[in-house]
Amino acid sequence: MKFKLIAEYFDRLEKISSRIQLTSLLSDLFKNTEREVIDKVVYLIQGRLWPDFTGMPEIGMGEKFLIKAIAMAYGNKEEEVEKLYKNIGDLGEVAYSLRSKVKGVSILSFVGGNQEAGELDVMEVYNELVKIATSTGEGSRDIKIRIFAGLIKKATPIEAKYLVRFVEGRLRLGIGDATVLDALAITFGGSADYRPIVERAYNLRADLGDIARVIATEGIEKLKNISPTPGIPIRPMLAERLPDPEEIMEKMNGKALVDYKYDGERAQIHRKGDKVTIFSRRMENITDQYIDVTEYVKQFVKGDNFIVEGEIVPVDPESGEMRPFQELMHRRRKNNIAEAIKEYPVNLFLFDLMFFEGEDYTTKPLPERRAKLEEILASNDKVHIASHIIADRVDKLREYFYQAISEGAEGVMVKSIGPDSIYQAGSRGWLWIKLKRDYQSEMADTVDLVVVGAFYGKGKRGGKFSSLLMAAYNPEKDVFETVCKVASGFSDQELDEMQKKINELKREQKHPRVVSDMIPDVWVSPTLVAEVIGAEITISPLHTCCRGEKGGLSIRFPRFIRWRDDKSPEDATTNQEIMEMYSKQLKKIEEKPVDENI
Ligand SMILES: Nc1ncnc2c1ncn2[C@@H]1O[C@H](COP(=O)(O)OP(=O)(O)OP(=O)(O)O)[C@@H](O)[C@H]1O
């Protein structure tokens, strides 16, 4: 399959303005894709070479290298390329422009050998990109530059443009997983009605390329039988939230398992033979940060082929007490991880089992999963089952909640133990409900919102971005709906970081997956997630989240708390959750005694 075809689709995808068109064009691309390479094409359109969970390096070639490679490929001086870059501001366009100018020479002689421009094959491109990503050690910089220069030398202008953006890590077509799943269902199932089958398979085996390969080469029927596979992450099950224990017990039909809600890092742990791999909440491979945990798991969890889930929590080695989750940050260091492991010891608190020795446990009710988990865990002081009780009265739940908090937990997770209490991979539902200690403020909880636009500041901050247009995620439509403009809570350092982040992601037009009536100074590709707290949720004509007759919902007095790099935009707070928070808040106001309202 020719790479040229893909580059042309990239160009068309970038210009599209609606989500529906995006899906249909993507489906068109899949129809024209040779089935053997569809997995690679899926990775490429998402700007990567492989799924994050592989832990394999992505390219991320810096500007300087690219300038060198472009100059080398097209016979320009580096200063010329730099100058052009200053004028245009996009190295992809620079490559496009310089490649277009190489006209005097016939394409054949320019390209060299007997390969014509436009003849690049997808696998050839992919393999060369893999070489660039994986070459390390002395001299590797020069090798990378040479390989890339060779590649764009053979490319057409449009191929060169997208290759440059790809290796720079700026191919931001903003095609989320949901759009790919829709397009796969339409292309290979025949209609969007097949989406649930494709989605279920993806939830259990979160490798989009692999799912595309199975459906394209073996058909939709094959997807129905997919089960979790150690080594490939499962999309995590998520909890709903409620601030009131009474309501929670009602939702649970009067009886539930109540776990401590530990404040650490979620870990999905896979064992396949001798190999133990740990995936984060975002399904990134974090094994290297927790080599100690992999050893504990090998030692204390019986079996050779399983997937379990738990929370990694820093502990005081002397007292065994829980420590603040910030201590885990030290484990992110690239160097001296061994020291961080020694200095900041952790324990693992397991709360679920999804797969054991060939058997899919995700379809079994929670009591069965937990019983097996207890059975396979040997007694030890590093890996524990999450502290829990079975509560059948509201006061029991309340009491346990306070106990959890007093021991340093963040609250409790209340979990259904009914016959339908399966592990709902990849979805947020009422089978798990979180009750957290910070449900005291007016707006019950913080929200995680996606940056979709930015505004320049005035006065002291003139010329710099100082506020952000934020959106919630609407999973049904797979779009981002605006809910507030955040201008406070940033430290000076965070403001500086913000300039960099926005400059990398800004775009001229609104992204097709963004629904907004407000027009910011610059639009931003929906990629960054920030945690935000506000005073309350109100109806507003300005915002598009949950828009009804009276307007949309908006967060008043929003304040930035921190970036949530561990979340992808599709993990942001949903429109549905904002609606639920709003209804809760209304109910609270109605329930207040009259005199308090005066
Ligand atoms: N016993 C437990 N059962 C399930 N999850 C737990 C448990 N203890 C701690 N957790 C953690 O709680 C998280 C969910 O709650 P929280 O809202 O604090 O996190 P979040 O990442 O902001 O939200 P979410 O994961 O629901 O999107 C889980 O992702 C998991 O890491």
Curated annotation (Swiss-Prot):
Protein name: DNA ligase
Name of the coding gene: lig
Stored CDD domains: Adenylation_DNA_ligase_Arch_LigB, OBF_DNA_ligase_I
Species annotation: Metallosphaera sedula (strain ATCC 51363 / DSM 5348 / JCM 9185 / NBRC 15509 / TH2)
Cell division is among the record's keywords: yes
EC number: 6.5.1.1
Keyword Transport: no
Residues reported to bind ATP: 259, 266, 281, 311, 351, 428, 434
Pfam name, any one: DNA_ligase_A_M
Active-site residues, as the UniProt record annotates them: 261
Catalysed reaction, written as an equation: ATP + (deoxyribonucleotide)n-3'-hydroxyl + 5'-phospho-(deoxyribonucleotide)m = (deoxyribonucleotide)n+m + AMP + diphosphate
Stored HAMAP family: DNA_ligase
Top-rank taxon: Archaea
Alphabetized PANTHER family for the sequence: DNA LIGASE 1, DNA LIGASE 1/3 FAMILY MEMBER
UniProtKB keywords: ATP-binding, Cell cycle, Cell division, DNA damage, DNA recombination, DNA repair, DNA replication, Ligase, Magnesium, Metal-binding, Nucleotide-binding
InterPro entries xrefs: ATP-dep_DNA_ligase, DNA_ligae_ATP-dep_bac/arc, DNA_ligase_ATP-dep, DNA_ligase_ATP-dep_C, DNA_ligase_ATP-dep_cent, DNA_ligase_ATP-dep_CS, DNA_ligase_ATP-dep_N, DNA_ligase_N_sf
